[in-house]
């Protein structure tokens, strides 16, 4: 049985990726925070697990048996999938390829695994016919060269490649050649009414961009930005766009894409830290998370308090890199 989304009458599944290394521990924290913050969520939480194959040099599956057991105890379903296009050379592609393993025709919400659920997700009024994604981002792509094409030429070349209407994607509230004028998301969350339709288009667009980029992309790097280059094209092609959700819910009161523990302690609200520390204090969760050194240091030692003391949340540096560099100078950066 899946949860009903308030305001839509539709049910939905949740997808995150879990594999060896830090993502397996982040998956535990995600699942535990979902259970804590939305105990009424009756849906299915899928933890997609890439399987060994020719695109992986090492076994990518979850290595810690305690993680696997706890995820199941928290109500998650571990969902194997095969890597046919990306694998180890582009692990961000897991979010693209995992979509094909979800139940067809059932609405889904994808979250990056380094996300904390902080409120009742089941009450978010998703309109699954109008896909969208996170606007908590910086202008990371494209990188404009002095004598190269500008934002408009680069993005238009991509819309033209896939036969999409470019002008309707623009936010005319921003000036020409300013990055926010162009449809650009953080791929930390996105949603749609059918994962397989979304995933097939995402895979098609991403692989085409990678193997046969338009000439305007000649100066651009696609690693690690490929998913965020293809995502706005997919969303626009499926009738979605910016802010098809009420503001302040995802990336607000209901979810926090923390990225790393030092960044969470540096910039997130007291409410987010309270959810983190309440969830992490549960004995079953604590026993598992302490095996991941960054969580052990930040949450339990607790170095996160020292990171938090470095910053004024009411006056944070505008650029994330400045925050990262400050933490690194103090010897407190871990991931």
Model-derived features with residue positions:
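Conserved donor-nucleotide/metal-binding helix-loop-beta segment in metal-dependent transferases, i.e.
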Residues: 117-157
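Charged, glycine/proline-rich intrinsically disordered loops and linkers
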Residues: 56-71, 146-174
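A structural signal for short, well-ordered beta-strand segments and their strand-loop junctions
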Residues: 46-48, 109-112, 117, 133-135, ...
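Conserved glycosyltransferase catalytic-site signature
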Residues: 24-28, 92-96, 187, 224-229
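A conserved donor-nucleotide-binding helix/loop in the catalytic core
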Residues: 81-111, 116-119, 123, 133-136
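A glycosyltransferase accessory/donor-loop signature
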Residues: 2-19, 171-188, 193-335
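Short, surface-exposed amphipathic charged segments that create phosphate/polyanion-binding patches used
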Residues: 91-98, 148-152, 260-264
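N-terminal anchoring/stem segment of glycosyltransferases
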Residues: 1-85, 104, 222, 297-335
